[in-house]
Amino acid sequence: MRTQSLKPYNANYHSLITRDAQERVDAPTDSGLISELVYSENQPAVAQLLLPLLQQLGKQSRWLLWLTPQQKLSRLWLQQSGLPMSKVVQARQINPLSTVDAMEKALLTGNYSVVLGWLPELSENDRIRLRMAAKLGNAYGFVMRPLNETKLDQGQCATLKIHSSLYH
């Protein structure tokens, strides 16, 4: 497993997002995908759902990138999960607001079969940017977002979370 820090990525996104971009990104394709997963600490099922896909993607020649601003991946969990340690890259200590930019840049490179990013709520523009980047880079992107427990108290339906045992 490799760990690295990323500096904020700034670019002109107007070249990626045009008036027709929404149609192109939302059209069914066989290359690239962005999915948002809202998860709860009390329900570790998302890890079990994602693990087979991550194991399959680990068989590709490309890297698996984890953009985790606050957390450090557990080496023990990676070993026990069957993910290829030599293909896992973790970028930490990223400003959470810069993580969207880092995720977009990583998806665009085509060097990663999957990019998992722990991100705040996305704007529609951010979603479009990430979908386009995933499509162009032929990669999977998983936007991981912790469940806001106060919203749960206000009647929002319970959703799944990746359990914190994945981290030190």
Curated annotation (Swiss-Prot):
<comment type="function">
    <text>Component of the SOS system and an inhibitor of cell division. Accumulation of SulA causes rapid cessation of cell division and the appearance of long, non-septate filaments. In the presence of GTP, binds a polymerization-competent form of FtsZ in a 1:1 ratio, thus inhibiting FtsZ polymerization and therefore preventing it from participating in the assembly of the Z ring. This mechanism prevents the premature segregation of damaged DNA to daughter cells during cell division.</text>
</comment>
<keyword id="KW-0742">SOS response</keyword>
<dbReference type="GO" id="GO:0000917">
    <property type="term" value="P:division septum assembly"/>
</dbReference>
<feature type="region of interest" description="Lon protease binding">
    <location>
        <begin position="161"/>
        <end position="168"/>
    </location>
</feature>
<dbReference type="InterPro" id="IPR050356">
    <property type="entry name" value="SulA_CellDiv_inhibitor"/>
</dbReference>
<keyword id="KW-0717">Septation</keyword>
<feature type="site" description="Essential for degradation by Lon protease">
    <location>
        <position position="168"/>
    </location>
</feature>
<dbReference type="InterPro" id="IPR027417">
    <property type="entry name" value="P-loop_NTPase"/>
</dbReference>
<comment type="subunit">
    <text>Interacts with FtsZ.</text>
</comment>
<keyword id="KW-0227">DNA damage</keyword>
<protein>
    <recommendedName>
        <fullName>Cell division inhibitor SulA</fullName>
    </recommendedName>
</protein>
<keyword id="KW-0131">Cell cycle</keyword>
<dbReference type="Pfam" id="PF03846">
    <property type="entry name" value="SulA"/>
</dbReference>
<dbReference type="InterPro" id="IPR047696">
    <property type="entry name" value="SulA_enterobact"/>
</dbReference>
<dbReference type="GO" id="GO:0051782">
    <property type="term" value="P:negative regulation of cell division"/>
</dbReference>
<dbReference type="GO" id="GO:0009432">
    <property type="term" value="P:SOS response"/>
</dbReference>
<feature type="region of interest" description="FtsZ binding">
    <location>
        <begin position="106"/>
        <end position="112"/>
    </location>
</feature>
<dbReference type="GO" id="GO:0006281">
    <property type="term" value="P:DNA repair"/>
</dbReference>
<dbReference type="InterPro" id="IPR004596">
    <property type="entry name" value="Cell_div_suppressor_SulA"/>
</dbReference>
<comment type="similarity">
    <text>Belongs to the SulA family.</text>
</comment>
<keyword id="KW-0132">Cell division</keyword>
